[in-house]
Amino acid sequence: MNLPIRVMIAGIGGASLGTEIRKSLTLAGGYEIYGCDVSKTAYGLYEDDFAETWCVSRDDYVTNVLNVCIESGTGFLIPGGEQPMTLLGAASDTFAAAGIQLLANTPEVIARYSDKDETFRRLAARGIPIPQTAVINTQSDLDQIGLPCIVKPATGSGGSVGVFFAVSPDEAMIYADFIRRTGSVPIAQQYVSDREGEFTIGVLSLPTGQIIGSIALRRVLDAKLSVAYRGRGGLISSGYSQGYIDEFPDLCQQAEQIALAVNSRGPINIQGRVRDGVLLPFEINPRFSASTYLRAMAGFNEVDLLIKYLLHREMPQRPEIQSGWYLRSLTEQFVAKEIVK
């Protein structure tokens, strides 16, 4: 009888990447899943599907996560969000020294492609089609972008946090000033219509750079959960992806070319809209996506595929995709005050 594979997920808040990763591992079977979070009210801390969970302090975060990994005997650690990815990715050697494999892209890819200004400059330099993108310092910077446009922070805008739709130069500068006052660098990006569809595409690469496969979801944008803003001829999607999963070979091939261009060595998620059949990425995240469980339901369980490769060093076969609609909602649970961690 094979022993279960022990995995730690760092970052398990409600409706988060971490809880979606947990569901993907549960679906695959054969895992003993542990979790940790910095918030004592994180949804996942009280989910029964975790073998054990910990509330860890933000202070000396990496050491605290390392300690609970050692305590639980986990061999794999998966960041469950953008901040854990950045912090833990930079310390991947620390975990490797303790015999713990971090399921993430390389520290170099994470550092380069977590900043949108650098991301889109690098993509343009590699000949990848992109929406016009520029840092906003003065109103004249908008000339190369055009209107309407999207204004957002260069870092930390996952789930469409701090993303604005601007129809005039004055409005764009107000949003840019707001972003700057929060300590971030504002960028403007050409607005691309969703007429030909908005897609989220996951590309999974091995540590060698070889691509296992990719999977695309065409987002449904008529549901309230999926829309952060709609009005004045523009639409901004939310962080809750749902929609239709199919092969979409042309778009997946374009996404795989992006993964190769950025030298991806693990999971990467590409969000974009299509114009004249060309995928125009507006967001690239070098990590698993919060739609990873939808992908697992469709047959492409990227978390399980990567772990199995790291264990056995055998190239997995590309799974067959079950085409169809993949929809989601929010769930609730009661936690008695006596058991809050």
Predicted regions and their residues:
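Short catalytic-loop micro-motif centered on adjacent basic/acidic residues
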Residues: 8-9, 76-79, 131-132, 187-190, ...
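Short histidine/acidic/glycine/proline-rich micro-motifs that form metal-
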Residues: 82-83, 107-111
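Short glycine-rich, flexible loops that bind phosphorylated cofactors or substrates
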Residues: 85-86, 158-159, 289, 293
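ATP-dependent carboxylate activation and anion-phosphoryl transfer catalytic cores
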Residues: 5, 10, 72, 244-341
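ATP-dependent carboxylate/phosphate-activation module, predominantly the ATP-grasp catalytic core
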Residues: 170, 178, 190-263, 285-311
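Short, charged, surface-exposed secondary-structure boundary motifs
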Residues: 44-45, 62-65, 111-115, 159-162, ...
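Active-site nucleotide/adenylate-binding loops and adjacent lid/helix of ATP-dependent enzymes
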Residues: 110-195, 205-210
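ATP-binding N-terminal substructure of ATP-dependent carboxylate-amine bond-forming enzymes
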Residues: 1-103
